Structures are given as C-alpha cells and as structure tokens.
UniProtKB/Swiss-Prot annotation:
Cofactor(s) recorded in Swiss-Prot or TrEMBL: pyridoxal 5'-phosphate
Lineage: Bacteria, Pseudomonadati, Pseudomonadota, Betaproteobacteria, Burkholderiales
Binding site for substrate: 20, 141, 366
Biological source species: Cupriavidus necator (strain ATCC 17699 / DSM 428 / KCTC 22496 / NCIMB 10442 / H16 / Stanier 337) (Ralstonia eutropha)
BP term (GO), one: biotin biosynthetic process
Protein name: 8-amino-7-oxononanoate synthase
Length: 404
C-alpha cells in the first residue's frame, strides 16, 4: 500500500514537471565544475547555481586550514557540545563571530551549529514557547517555516515586506513575547527585507527580531559582516542567524544574540543539545575563511561580485523585455529570472545545459505557483567572460524560441 501510494505521488509530480533529481559533482565547488548523473561520465559545466558567493569553498588557505585542523583535532568531535565534543576551535570561532557582531548586538555572544536549518529550528522552538507569538514574513525560508510549525507559540504571517500589515498585527497582539521572524536576503528573490523599519516596529511594540542572514553574511557590508553592518543597525532586540556554508565557503551556522539568550539556547535548544558537534577541523577552517572575508582580499572579491551583478542585470533586463520574462528586483548575488511555467523553466535550464551552462530551475512549492524561474547566483570567482557567456547563451535561447 505504501509503495503504491508513493508511486502515484511520483507520477503526479512528474506530470506537473515537479520531479527533483540529484546531480553528481566530480570536482570542487567552483564556477567550472565537472558534473554528471549517477554512473555517467561527467561533463564540464559553467555553474551559476551555487551559494559560494565569495568563491571560498575551494580557496587554498581555507583548504589548508581544514587539513591543519584535522591533523590537530582529528576527523570528528566524538560527542555533543555539552558532553565532550566542544573543542578549542569551536570556542575560538564563536569568539571571533561575537567580535564581528558586537557593534550591532550589545553584550553579544554566539553559538555555532552544524547547519543553518538546525540553527533556525533551535531559535524558534527555544524562544517560541507557549504564550509567545511569532510574526513570520510570508516568504521565509523553509527552515524558519518548519521551526515556527514546531514551536508552541501562536504563529501569524504578514505579506511580503508589508510593514503596515505587520504593525497592525503587532498593535493588536496581547502576547507576552512578540518575535518578528524574517530572512534578510530572500533566497528565491534576492531582495532585502526592510530591517530598519522592522526594528522601529520592534522597539515601538516591545518585540524582538529574529533575522536569518543566510545570504548576506560574508557578502554584505564594508567588511562582509552582513546585513546589520550594511544597514548600520544596532539593537539589543536583534537575534541574528548567520550561515557559514555559503559565502564563508565551509559549513555550519551560528546564532548571535545577547548573552542571556545564548545561555538559554545552550540549555534548552534541542537541535543544539541532542546532536554530535561539528568536526573541530571545520571550525578551524572557518577561522581562515573569516580572515579572508574581513581582509583586503575579501574587499576585492566583493568588488568583483558587484561588477558581475551589474553586468548580469543589465543584460538580463534587455533579454527579459524581449522574451516576456520578469527580472526580479534584486541587487544581490541572487538574480531570479521568472519564466512562469514549470515546463518552460525546465526547458530553458536544459537548453543552457546543452550549451555547457548549469542554472537551476526553481518550481513550486519552493516558489509560488506560476512563478517558476531560473535562480541565477553569482560568485566572486566568476569573471566577466563567464557572465558574458551566460548572457550569450540566453540570447541564443530567446532567438531560437522566436524562430520556432
């Protein structure tokens, strides 16, 4: 019975062009990567779908630090943080991250997690207790949505970036604990949440803000310290979540907040307590990554990324006008080219791959019905020639469609 039900579900997904499949990377994460199917010979593809925004996943200094960390601390941690798995490398990483966030969160401490999903689940379930209310942005990442579902708090959603609607909800709430929950950079659209206004509302209505800066940490801000640095925000009411497997190029995530909140998470957050700590070598490698992000090389890499974003947007705007597509309103490394139909998005992705370029087609339920898209992501490791090649391939696809 179970297998038959699952087969029918698979058939329905296939009919709606919603089937997902894994590809196999045979080489390191980089703009040019050897990619294949299970059991097939790989082909070299120019890739515009990773979240390695700073191009650090294959950086020699980060790799060397990972090797050094493994030699010093071993391959694994052996236990959870609260048993015997918390190492000097974890402590040093948390201290460095706290230094980064200290100008924006008074009395800041940080807590390192194995994944961003776990960090989001931990914060929402530990703070979203009975009697609390979570005011959730409608386009939040799935991990924030799942965390809200598991929390015992009341959950209220407000429309995308609609601060007036949020203020009405806050004003009407009698909750003893109000928590505004939002992405900073929205993962499928690339636009930035109105955090300055959200902070004003939090202060006015005695609320706190949980900000998931997964796609901003390491990229935004003069030193790459993230969206809070970029916007010049500072408040005790900020609970900040940063991802370390995207721009930082390695793995994991962290929560930065007032020391009292971090102490509460250490003692109550089940995704932190009941799992084996990440390998110390990963934390050691992240220290090298943070040094690059904050230093002169990081500044140069962010400048290169900015150049590529501007070049890509200029070309995509022209193509979208011809093809009837919609280019999302994004100034970040995430550039959504909205095609609309699921099949059309898959076909365009396949056309590009036949030309040696890999761009993922994003479909419901990840995005709303009728907004299937190519999610084009840029890296500081991309060159202007890489961007030009993508634009030329898209232009050829548009011309081919016009002829057909």
């Amino acid at each position: 019975m179970l297998l038959e039900q699952l087969r029918r579900a698979a058939e329905q997904r296939h009919a709606l062009a919603l089937t997902r499949r894994r590809r196999v990377a045979h080489t390191a994460c980089a703009p040019h990567q050897a990619v294949g199917e299970d059991g097939s010979e790989p082909e070299s593809l120019l890739t515009f779908c990773s979240n390695d925004y700073m191009g650090l996943a294959n950086h020699p200094d980060v790799i060397a630090a990972l090797v050094e960390g493994a030699q010093r601390y071993g391959a694994g941690s052996g236990a959870s943080h609260l048993v015997s798995g918390h190492s000097l490398a974890h402590t040093q990483l948390e201290a460095e991250l706290a230094r980064w966030l200290a100008p924006h969160i008074p009395h800041a401490c940080t807590l390192y997690f194995c994944t961003g999903y776990m960090a989001n689940m931990a914060v929402l379930t530990a703070l979203g207790t009975a009697g609390a209310t979570l005011f959730c942005e409608s386009l939040n990442h799935a991990s924030l949505i799942d965390g809200a579902r598991l929390a015992r708090a009341d959950v209220q959603r407000y429309p995308h970036c609609d601060t007036a609607a949020l203020e009405a909800l806050l004003a009407a709430s009698t909750s003893e604990r109000k928590l505004i929950v939002t992405d900073s950079v929205f993962s499928m659209d690339g636009n930035v949440a109105p955090l300055r206004k959200l902070l004003e509302l939090a202060e006015r209505h005695d609320a706190w803000i949980i900000v998931d800066d997964a796609h901003g940490f390491g990229v935004l801000g003069e030193q790459g310290h993230g969206v809070l640095e970029a916007l010049g925000l500072s408040s005790e009411r900020l609970i900040y979540i940063g991802t370390l497997g995207k721009a930082a190029g390695v793995a994991g995530a962290f929560v930065a907040a007032h020391e009292t909140i971090i102490e509460h998470l250490v003692n109550t957050a089940r995704p932190y307590i009941y799992t084996t700590a990440a390998p110390p070598a990963v934390a050691h490698a992240l220290l090298a990554s943070l040094a690059i992000i904050e230093g002169e090389e990081g500044t140069q890499r962010r400048a290169q990324l900015t150049r590529c974003i501007g070049m890509l947007r200029e070309g995509l705007a022209q193509l979208a006008a011809i093809a009837g597509w919609t280019l999302g309103d994004s100034e970040t490394a995430i550039q959504p080219l909205i095609v609309g139909d699921n099949g059309a998005a898959l076909a365009l992705s396949a056309t590009l791959e036949a030309d040696g370029i890999r761009v993922g087609a994003i479909r419901p339920p990840t995005v709303p019905e009728g907004t299937a898209r190519l999610r084009i992501t840029l890296s500081a490791a991309h060159t202007e020639d890489d961007v030009r090649r993508l634009l030329d391939a898209l232009s050829a696809a548009v011309a081919q469609r016009e002829v057909a």
